């Protein structure tokens, strides 16, 4: 929808501390599971960081999964809190998420509280109260005092997040990742493989249901800024993401091989109008990038880039 929001490190820190206060207020503690059914927005990142800080276990799904996909995954982990956004947009179309809430709660009895986020730049959709479920609006969190309690230190092996297999061979399988392992692996990939530096701007086109979302968020540990995008990557313009990358001075641009294939099919000419002066690295994942894909990047996007 063209909405842009920016937060400083200080603002992020304050918001996360308020979320910690909220978690403690509703009796969320270490090893409790927090499930998120949200688009890729700042509040989702903040809720994840807050969960990590108190030792809770995070798990997220993208709104495009649909109700059966969410129930298949979250019913296995028995979350105590569900974080959900009221709606999301794809290719200009508004899609109601909050109307799915009763069906989810009916099947996942472990959920005791629901935190509703509003889609960035849009008014919150109206929602009905649900019996025996405490429902909170994210605006309530903004009014809370920041948590000043010293955070507990957890073991290297303490659980951080639960991700899922694709579900192509039956029910999606839960995969629990430890905090120390994830942090160490991501720092290695970011700083050694991708040369991410403090003050870099890191972007990856991903939803919250893909492991690249977790990879993107961890770039904060390298003192880089992260750029979030939600929606259809070619809305109104096939080179939309590249235009954003240029405007935001992105240094690492992450996409899928399928995205590059689409640029090839649509014969997008990037070099002629988008200079991408700050861009150092392009990452492609999801499937192997073809020989044509490599050649297209160097010929049409940027010659002097680490791909």
For each feature predicted by the language model, list its residue ranges.
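A short helix-loop-beta submotif of the ANL/AMP-binding
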Residues: 20, 33, 39-67, 77-82, ...
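Structural core segment of the AMP-binding/adenylate-forming
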Residues: 53-139, 249, 256-257
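Conserved AMP-binding/adenylation subdomain of ANL enzymes
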Residues: 181-201, 210-251, 266-269
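ATP-dependent adenylate-forming carboxylate-activation enzymes
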Residues: 38-39, 59-76, 88-89, 93-96, ...
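Conserved S/T- and glycine-rich ATP-binding loop of Class I adenylate-forming
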Residues: 34, 51, 159, 165-168, ...
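Conserved pre-ATP/AMP-binding loop-to-beta segment of ANL
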Residues: 116, 128-164, 171, 179-181, ...
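Gly/Ser/Thr-rich phosphate-binding loop
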Residues: 224, 250-255, 264-307
């Amino acid at each position: 929808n063209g909405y842009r929001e920016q937060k400083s490190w200080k603002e992020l820190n304050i918001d996360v501390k308020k979320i910690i206060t909220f978690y403690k207020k509703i009796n969320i503690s270490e090893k409790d599971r927090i499930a998120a059914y949200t688009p890729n927005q700042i509040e989702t990142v903040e809720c994840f960081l807050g969960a990590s800080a108190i030792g809770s276990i995070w798990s997220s799904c993208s709104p495009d999964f649909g109700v059966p996909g969410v129930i298949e995954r979250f019913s296995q982990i028995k979350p105590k809190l569900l974080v959900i956004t009221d709606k999301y947009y794809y290719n200009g179309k508004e899609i109601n998420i909050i109307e799915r809430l009763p069906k989810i709660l009916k099947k996942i009895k472990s959920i005791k509280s629901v935190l509703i986020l509003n889609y960035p730049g849009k008014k919150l959709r109206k929602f009905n109260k649900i019996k025996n479920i405490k429902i909170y609006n994210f605006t309530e969190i903004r009014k809370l005092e920041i948590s000043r309690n010293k955070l507990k230190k957890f073991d290297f092996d303490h659980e951080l997040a639960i991700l899922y297999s694709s579900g192509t061979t039956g029910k999606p399988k839960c995969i629990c990742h430890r905090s120390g392992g994830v942090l160490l692996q991501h720092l290695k990939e970011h700083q050694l493989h991708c040369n991410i530096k403090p003050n870099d701007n890191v972007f990856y086109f991903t939803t919250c249901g893909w492991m690249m979302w977790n990879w993107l968020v961890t770039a904060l540990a390298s003192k880089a800024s992260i750029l979030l995008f939600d929606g259809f990557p070619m809305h109104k313009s096939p080179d939309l993401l590249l235009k954003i990358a240029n405007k935001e001075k992105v240094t690492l641009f992450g996409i899928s091989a399928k995205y590059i294939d689409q640029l090839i099919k649509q014969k997008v000419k990037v070099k002629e109008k988008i200079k991408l002066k700050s861009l150092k690295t392009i990452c492609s994942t999801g499937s192997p990038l073809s020989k044509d894909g490599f050649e297209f990047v160097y010929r049409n996007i940027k010659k002097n880039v680490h791909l």
